[in-house]
């Protein structure tokens, strides 16, 4: 009987320790080097045919915003826009844009520049 109590206690402690880091805190986005970017474009929906490419100035603004992230929050959100970053090596990253947040996967940062990126789409719509 003592053996079972010890085994249950050990199992309980191990379970609690192993679950402690289930959701590790991610503090910043992975940095983006603007030299490695082939292009960035924005869409209203994930599978939208209307695509707007970012200018060099817009790319720099976006890269600076992502690289300045200092605190990310884990959240679920329905994006208003999708931003696709295509790199010269073939990799791609997708960011979601809501009213006040920019996110990658489920990690978001609060920003005041979402209107800037939304206006790029609104002012330069073209069909691909």
Task: Label each PLM-derived region with a short phrase.
Residues 19-128:
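Function-determining sites in protein domains
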Residues 1-21:
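Sec-dependent bacterial lipoprotein signal peptides
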